[in-house]
Amino acid sequence: MSSVEELFEAMHAWPEVEAIALGGSRATGNADEKSDYDVYLYVTAPVPTQRRKKLLSDYCSRMEIDNNFWENEDNCTLNDGTDIDILYRDLDSFMNGVADVVEHFHASNGYTTCLWHNVITSTIVFDRNGRFAAAQRRFSVPFPEPLRRNIIERNTRLLHGNLPSYDAQIRKVAIRGDEVAVNHRVAAFMESYFDVLFALNRLTHPGEKRLEKLASRNCAILPKDFEANLDTLFGTMFTDVDQLSGTLQIIVDNLQRSVDTNL
């Protein structure tokens, strides 16, 4: 039994833990030698931090217990040097949030279906009463067409064609030479761009990493010159205002053609 498996087994004994799931690249088959462990503990009550610290100290060379930057997490490095992130999620409230997307079709500004993707692609390590497996069955459904349309409508409007759209914001800050703001707005542009692209293909959003590679591999519908235009965008975003502006226009035009053809 590996040290990680021993750690998981010890967590089984915590009465608050309803399920343990392994997510991220180690669950989806996209892991490499640098991949960390993304571990999700679905709980019915908070697990005391002192108990968490006591257990993890046997397996980790570095620990940050009870970080709350995004979710409630223990961010650690295992004794073998591999990073491990342990996230604590209230089972009921988390699944209600997934249902809000999958069953009530609520779209966000980018990353709409990431948590849905996380649930249905996670590997179950422990499931005390079968509730996580039941949630996986509940949400393992075809991509709802109302959700698809809501994501595409909301995020294409963020990309272009409206006063607060990202393309116009990027052009304004690029003309000013504000590189920090250019970086910030291009990142937001990409969030909505990939949200549209995955929804258009009826695919759940895989998260923030390897998006260009995953889209190229998994999306049957891709805008014309998908990879080349992204390369040009990132190659000119700080150096050539005119080419940046022109590339943005090409990207939104090509995406809109794909939407118009396939929606």
Where are the model-predicted features located?
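A short alpha-helix capping/helix-coil boundary motif
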Residues: 7-8, 52-54, 147-150
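Helical scaffold of the NTase/Pol beta-like nucleotidyltransferase catalytic core
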Residues: 1-21
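Conserved NTP/Mg2+-binding pocket subregion across the NTase superfamily
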Residues: 60-174
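Conserved nucleotidyltransferase catalytic core and NTase-mimicking acidic/glycine-rich helix/loop elements
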Residues: 131-263
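A generic local structural motif
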Residues: 5-9, 25-27, 71
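Catalytic metal-binding acidic patch
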Residues: 23-58, 73-89
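Short, solvent-exposed loop/turn segments at secondary-structure junctions
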Residues: 27-28, 91-93, 204-205
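Hydrophobic, Leu/Ile/Phe/Ala-enriched alpha-helical segments that form helix-helix packing faces
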Residues: 11, 56-63, 255
